[in-house]
Amino acid sequence: MKPDAHQVKQFLLNLQDTICQQLTAVDGAEFVEDSWQREGGGGGRSRVLRNGGVFEQAGVNFSHVHGEAMPASATAHRPELAGRSFEAMGVSLVVHPHNPYVPTSHANVRFFIAEKPGAEPVWWFGGGFDLTPFYGFEEDAIHWHRTARDLCLPFGKDVYPRYKKWCDDYFYLKHRNEQRGIGGLFFDDLNTPDFDHCFAFMQAVGKGYTDAYLPIVERRKAMAYGERERNFQLYRRGRYVEFNLVWDRGTLFGLQTGGRTESILMSMPPLVRWEYDYQPKDGSPEAALSEFIKVRDWV
């Protein structure tokens, strides 16, 4: 089947609505919407929930941009895109909870298509979701990865292991020699065997995110915590900022190509701290995190 960008766009708009409704149902606070237009073509809907009952900040962003030609930075690596008009669309979200026992989570699903008359379109899907705990709970990690594995199974037994490894490899801070969190799924350049199959997988990932995340939120959101746990959460959030500004391809591409800065940086935690040469006490729950986030098979 020929790629249907309109069908993908409708799914993404509905996905943004659904995820916002689900997060509001858990939190009680409402999202504030900021609609924007891109000068070169397209626009989006950025939605942010701030200082809610559960979430310190949750951002759920939809964007759909298009243009007559790709930027040179993109065609340098993919010469087949030169001279083509393009459309890029996606939903991207990050949730930063108040409670340090509730992990931060991130998800993204996206579609890209470039066309020119008389030629087959070039298209692909990408996306995934990943979890960044501050305090490790095995049952949470197992639930997260089991949900990821189960949504992948209808698409082949090798899908989950492949995209889990890709996620582990991608969300890695080389300058710290550590993982950002416990991973999940990451895929890109997906265009085989056909559009329908790839679109169905992208939909499964988009819908699977809240199935994976919200039960963990419900389990941890009422746990008591104090200043020590909060300080550790803010310190570990520093790793999130470091990854996004130093290594994340999407953030760098968006900033380098004149994307909407407010929406791109919506993933940033509202409060964060750094501490020179911080070392958690041996045997403490904080010290245990470095071992917990090491790559392993959770299911």
From Swiss-Prot:
Q: What is its main location?
A: cytoplasm
Which pathway, per its entry? Porphyrin-containing compound metabolism; protoporphyrin-IX biosynthesis; protoporphyrinogen-IX from coproporphyrinogen-III (O2 route): step 1/1
Any Pfam family the entry gives: Coprogen_oxidas
Q: Which GO terms describe its cellular component?
A: cytoplasm
Q: Which residues bind Mn(2+)?
A: H96, H106, H145, H175
- State the reactions this protein catalyses: coproporphyrinogen III + O2 + 2 H(+) = protoporphyrinogen IX + 2 CO2 + 2 H2O
Q: In this UniProt entry, which residues are annotated as the site Important for dimerization? A: H175
Q: Which family does it belong to?
A: Belongs to the aerobic coproporphyrinogen-III oxidase family.
Q: How does it assemble?
A: Homodimer.
| Name listed for the protein in its UniProt record | Oxygen-dependent coproporphyrinogen-III oxidase
Q: Which organism is it from?
A: Escherichia coli O157:H7
Q: Which gene encodes it?
A: hemF
